[in-house]
């Protein structure tokens, strides 16, 4: 599509609908996975390990996801990711066996990698660069809305059918997501061969290693910044409830604080994307991280529910205005040929950060204090802001002109 003919309304249902439903499905089952493991007799440490298999499945599946997307096309990779997740939910909900349950958790992580990479690659291909940040921010926003709605729908189903009801909601949402995604035009039908690029007069088959070598500067600079961003974002989700527990707040109060912060986070995605498209990526990326960092540094200074709410809202505001920034920067710098390989490596770095962030918080909390660990996470946000402020290309002042094809 050209900028003159492109409209968000044209792609809203088929592009964002699957993401909304995928988020709803995952939001429905993620809170009950630990409860299911405990009901099956798993100890608390084993339950934590089983939940961690979801993140591990995503981490280890980013490269295979890129290969699947390159081979079968974005549309069918999105469909496969949704259906694979539905199957995984069935294993978790009705197996009755911890080994099969563990496999289901790992498969959920696999499906996240496949679905997320393929949808990002698809929209990078079809959306004009002038609208890219708005679309990527909306993509991230619809996923967050789905994740927000999911637990409420699951709660009603659990009331009627027990824990299995949540998995039923998740499976229905994922199947609907796959059906809707199947209506997307198939990019593999286009004339461009994304598996090869021409060097001189000879085509060269692209591999993960060749893509890594060709884009190593991007991964070492912007990629490192994205790793830090991912670590901060994941750790903030743990830091707020842990500090609430440190303040001895009631669980219901903690839930309200977290819910209000999530609402702020969820509502800011489109304005942020518009600013990125019109003024440049740096105008959103840097303020997002600075605000998150300030909120995290303030968090250990809070002493009651009111001050904790203010800090949590600041953190959520910073994260909310940065909705879609990781996907946008990845899309901006992904090459036309081998795009799925590039995005697989990009997501791999983000998942490494997501895995390491909470581990660092845990280590600092154990060796120093919880407040020190949270403050270190805030400092990491400022470090990421500086890294990205320096390395986001100045030519990218508007609408991602730094993209290379």
Regions found by a protein language model. Name each.
Residues 73, 94-96, 280, 302-303:
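Helix-breaking motifs and short loop linkers at transmembrane-helix boundaries and internal kinks
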Residues 9-55, 221, 230-243:
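Helix-loop boundary and gating motifs at the non-cytosolic
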Residues 172-194, 384-392:
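C-terminal membrane-cytosol helix-exit motif in multi-pass small-molecule transporters
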Residues 1-9, 186-222, 405:
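Juxtamembrane intracellular "pre-TM" segments in multi-pass secondary transporters
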């Amino acid at each position: 599509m050209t900028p003159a003919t492109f409209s968000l309304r044209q792609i809203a249902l088929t592009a964002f609908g699957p993401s909304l439903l995928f988020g709803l499905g995952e939001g429905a089952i993620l809170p009950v996975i630990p409860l299911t493991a405990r009901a099956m007799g798993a100890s608390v440490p084993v339950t934590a390990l089983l939940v961690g298999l979801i993140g591990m499945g995503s981490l280890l599946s980013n490269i295979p996801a890129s290969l699947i997307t390159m081979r079968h096309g974005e549309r069918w990779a999105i469909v496969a990711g949704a259906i694979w997740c539905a199957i995984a939910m069935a294993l978790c909900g009705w197996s009755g066996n911890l080994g099969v349950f563990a496999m289901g958790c790992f498969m959920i992580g696999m499906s996240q990698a496949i679905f997320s990479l393929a949808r990002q690659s698809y929209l990078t291909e079809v959306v004009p660069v002038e609208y890219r940040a708005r679309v990527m921010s909306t993509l991230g926003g619809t996923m967050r809305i789905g994740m927000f709605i999911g637990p409420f729908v699951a709660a009603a189903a659990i009331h009627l059918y027990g824990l299995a009801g949540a998995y039923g909601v998740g499976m229905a949402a994922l199947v609907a997501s796959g059906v809707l995604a199947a209506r997307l035009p198939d990019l593999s039908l286009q004339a461009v061969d994304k598996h090869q690029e021409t060097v001189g007069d000879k085509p060269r088959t692209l591999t993960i290693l060749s893509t890594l070598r060709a884009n190593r500067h991007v991964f070492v600079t912007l990629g490192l910044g994205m790793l830090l961003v991912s670590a901060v974002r994941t750790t903030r989700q743990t830091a707020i409830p842990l500090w609430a527990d440190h303040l001895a707040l009631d669980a219901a109060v903690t839930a309200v604080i977290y819910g209000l912060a999530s609402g702020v986070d969820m509502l800011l995605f489109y304005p942020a994307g518009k600013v990125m498209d019109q003024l440049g990526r740096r105008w959103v990326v840097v303020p997002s991280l600075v605000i998150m960092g300030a909120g995290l540094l303030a968090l250990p200074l809070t002493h009651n529910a009111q001050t904790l709410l203010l800090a949590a809202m600041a953190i959520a505001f910073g994260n909310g205005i940065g909705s879609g920034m990781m996907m946008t920067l990845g899309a901006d710098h992904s090459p036309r040929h081998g795009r799925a390989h590039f995005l697989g490596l990009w997501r791999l770095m983000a998942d490494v950060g997501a895995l390491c962030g909470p581990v660092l918080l845990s280590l600092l909390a154990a060796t120093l204090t919880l407040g020190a660990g949270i403050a270190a996470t805030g400092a990491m946000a400022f470090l990421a802001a500086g890294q990205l402020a320096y390395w986001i290309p100045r030519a990218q002042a508007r609408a991602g002109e730094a993209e290379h094809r």
